[in-house]
Amino acid sequence: MILELDCGNSFIKWRVISPGGRERICAGIVDSDDGLFEALAGSGVKVQRCRLVSVRSDAETEQLVTRLKASLGVEVVCAQSSSQVGGVRNGYHDYQRLGLDRWLALLGGYHLGQRACLVVDLGTAVTADFVSADGEHLGGFICPGLPLMRDQLSTHTRRIRYDREVALAALQELEPGRSTAEAVERGCLLMLRGFVAEQLAQARSRFPGGFEVFLTGGDAELVRDAVPEAQVVPDLVFVGLAIACPLS
């Protein structure tokens, strides 16, 4: 079995797949290294190989890799920056500066679409990347995601305070808010949708011959109905990870 890890800024997304990658055995999201090992122990699955992508610091990533090797007895393959992989050419002036999660997501999108594509990852931050039909990464955009927008308002505005349940309830519709929670949550979501709409407009201009749209990340479902042509692929980073780090 192969353990795949996507170590983000706030959470670790994990899944165990069959050796050929065709079957997902189990999966989950945890908020700490301890939570990861508890989840793996509870799954009862024996892992033979492991590959991961991390946007953590080098020290934090190395600490996790060391623990994985000691606890699971496996070698760990880590995704690295590259100028070209899987038919896609990195579009950054300095390819090492492109976030690994973005790189893998656009690799995954191009692999699935097999033509020009727009890849939007809606997490703590929101990223949008454009890939041409011949695999040229044309660059992209980054903006705060819902968690960051929400946190900034609560941090810098004393009277904005509400819990997660209230936030979720506020997003059931997008009418003008009749409470602070509704006004904040709906306003932030409308900003997010506006960002995505602009990416679509740019993609239509850049790719007159047609393109695919891929949404991924924890908040992808919140903009799905605004982008009916999009494919929501929760594991898009893992699709790219398999391309960047093949395991024989």
UniProtKB/Swiss-Prot annotation:
ATP binds at residues 6-13, 124. GO terms for cellular component: cytoplasm. It holds the Pfam family Pan_kinase. GO terms for biological process: coenzyme A biosynthetic process. Disulfide bonds: none annotated. It is found in: Cytoplasm. InterPro entries: ATPase_NBD, Type_III_PanK. Its EC number is 2.7.1.33. Pathway: Cofactor biosynthesis; coenzyme A biosynthesis; CoA from (R)-pantothenate: step 1/5. K(+) binds at residue 121. It comes from the Bacteria. Substrate binds at residues 92, 99-102, 180. A monovalent cation. Ammonium or potassium. It catalyses: (R)-pantothenate + ATP = (R)-4'-phosphopantothenate + ADP + H(+). One of its GO terms (molecular function) is ATP binding. Its cofactor is NH4(+); K(+). The active site is at residue 101. Keywords: ATP-binding, Coenzyme A biosynthesis, Cytoplasm, Kinase, Metal-binding, Nucleotide-binding, Potassium, Transferase. Homodimer. HAMAP family: Pantothen_kinase_3. PANTHER family: TYPE III PANTOTHENATE KINASE (PTHR34265:SF1). Catalyzes the phosphorylation of pantothenate (Pan), the first step in CoA biosynthesis. This is Type III pantothenate kinase. The gene is coaX.
